[in-house]
């Protein structure tokens, strides 16, 4: 299934080029791999990885987007083909985004999905490990998020909803350490930080959020939506606000839960990270490959979509949510149904 196939290239010095209809990977003058381009939905290149113009053009024609990241996983650039989609759909998208009341309604649905999933994640950890000293605190944080969810209907404008999001984020990340089962001082999580991440947990979260952004943005573009024009996130030049909006539903249940799994199961530990002179904490090459492999495998897991009541791979959820948003904008649905984890 095309929407599950993202190629990650981490070998430094690798050169990607077109070989007939295939993508070829050359390292030190030797061709190591060949892949049919039409089977891919994305390519993500880390660090010193180069690509021929002919391959870039070929991938763009096949609707395969390419993202270039620094070796540590920071987003640098993106190459994509022409924008597709019905211009009428985009017009409706822009009109809705210009309507304060409609924007608030849409932002409320997105935020409801995010907070529901944050709450579900906290409750899952408390239920799975009731013997842990922090289980009571996790339940209390989940209850506080439930209270914030109940207040969302009373917020009539987007600024008030953003304030509620900030409050909920503080509650969630204050409780986050209680979901970590490791006690090593090197793995201590003292709050969300980025640019640069200052501890191993934040380093993994930042990398997973980058992967999530790639997949969500690609899904939105594939159905003809403009990833720059959002509802919950403010418009800003170069900022993919709609992609950031839709990401919110998936951060707690895909990226955050995966980070917890990688640490709690011992797949990552203190030795898998290095500290730069600036204080930035980055993954080793081997650790980065561990995260990539886990992400690929997770996208292949099957789940039941809560709105459609159909089973599908996790990797299809982003595309499905993009389709549901497009259906709402066309008037086929009364409201946008966020992804609610169970």
Predicted regions and their residues:
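Active-site helix-to-loop segments that bind/position phosphate- or nucleotide-bearing substrates
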Residues: 1-17, 28, 34, 85-342
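N-terminal ordered "arm"
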Residues: 17-49
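A surface-exposed, charged beta-strand/loop segment in the N-terminal or early-internal portion
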Residues: 39, 47-120
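Short His-Asn-centered micro-motif
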Residues: 45-48, 69, 192, 208
